[in-house]
């Protein structure tokens, strides 16, 4: 499971994460199902929203795994 998927589960779903970040649920769906990573500009906010349960390092690893 990718870090972005874990983040979504922790926060209660794609819609919840999208609202926290000010994006649409479809953006989050694309990150999970097409890109398998969150855009870099959201990584710190996602980690903070999960209260560190998903670290910045884990979210960055998603980027490394797809390159």
Residue ranges of each PLM-predicted region?
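Short amphipathic helical patch at the helix-1/turn junction of helix-turn-helix
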Residues: 8-9
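Short glycine/proline-centered loop/turn elements that form peptide/ligand docking sites
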Residues: 12
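Short, charged recognition helix plus adjacent turn
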Residues: 2-5, 15, 19, 25-26, ...
């Amino acid at each position: 499971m990718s870090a972005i998927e874990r983040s979504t589960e922790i926060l209660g779903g794609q819609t919840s994460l999208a609202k926290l970040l000010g994006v649409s649920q479809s953006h989050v769906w694309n990150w999970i199902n097409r890109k398998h990573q969150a855009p870099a500009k959201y990584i710190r906010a996602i980690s903070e929203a999960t209260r560190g349960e998903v670290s910045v390092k884990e979210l960055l690893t998603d980027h490394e795994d797809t390159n």
